[in-house]
Amino acid sequence: MALPIILDCDPGHDDAIALVLALASPELALKAVTSSAGNQTPDKTLRNVLRMLTLLNRTDIPVAGGARKPLMRDLIIADNVHGETGLDGPALPEPTFKPQACTAVELMVKVLRESDEPVTLVATGPQTNVALLLNSHPELHRKIARIVIMGGSMGLGNWTPAAEFNIFVDPEAAEIVFQSGLPIVMAGLDVTHRAQIMSADVERFRAIGNPVATTVAELLDFFMEYHKAEKWGFHGAPLHDPCTIAWLLKPELFTTVDRWVGVETQGKYTQGMTVVDYYSLTGNKPNTTLMVDIDRQGFVDLLAERLAQFSIR
């Protein structure tokens, strides 16, 4: 039986590819997509969800827009990474359907209440919507199987020296999620920086030849430009968000450890840092399954295999 999931995302090139991977995988049942503000403004990320689902011919999936700003802070966006639209690069279709007349949290609540089994939440942007859900509906925690997030790291940041972007945008929300007592699975920079897509991989995807694979290749053409800067030391582009979906599909591709994680919300230099108690120094019980390594080639092969599914539909 397919695993029911809700995807809360802020597309964003890698969010869009995570969405593609989820919908190419019969092991997963995508019950709803909610948008968060992060990689671009809330209106643009919501529109990008609708554009991608239009491309994928999945306008049957309910969509709702989420919080317009973090819980306690002004919104920061990553337009320097994802461009003016948030999905610069390919010529995506205009949306052919509209979002639900409700908020992201209201849609999540509806899905959770109607589900016969616990639902996995996958959050690939800032954690604002998920935190609002957890705080406002404690009675539904039992309907959440786990929360799989892309965010954080063990010490290295990509937005500040200490903080990864998604957590930095709304650290208060992330702290609520990590301390919720629910099972948390974290795909942080430690693993996503090892999930680099190389130029040869992009050409492999392009050669698949169907419109979805071509769009993914064109998304990556744009996404790779930002990551060519010498400061990163990358050979390709780290494909952060699809690691969450890949873990659900093939956890054997990943090395994980269970550790306690907290989020720094006030540090002068460390706001948004995920503090990972790797050596169990605090005595705190582990609250997070932390991805620390990946079979990169297996990850690329999975993406290529699933992109090819769109050729036979």
From Swiss-Prot:
It holds the Pfam family IU_nuc_hydro. GO terms for molecular function: purine nucleosidase activity; uridine nucleosidase activity. It is an enzyme of class 3 (hydrolase). InterPro entries: I/U_nuclsd_hydro_CS (IPR015910), Inosine/uridine_hydrolase_dom (IPR001910), IUNH (IPR023186), Pyrim_hydro_RihA (IPR022975), Ribo_hydro-like (IPR036452). GO terms for biological process: nucleobase-containing small molecule interconversion; purine nucleoside catabolic process; pyrimidine nucleobase metabolic process. Its EC number is 3.2.-.-. The active site is at H240. It comes from the Bacteria. SUPFAM superfamilies: Nucleoside hydrolase (SSF53590). One of its GO terms (cellular component) is cytosol. Keywords: Glycosidase, Hydrolase. Hydrolyzes cytidine or uridine to ribose and cytosine or uracil, respectively. Belongs to the IUNH family. RihA subfamily. This is Pyrimidine-specific ribonucleoside hydrolase RihA. The lineage of its organism: Bacteria, Pseudomonadati, Pseudomonadota, Gammaproteobacteria, Enterobacterales. The gene is rihA.
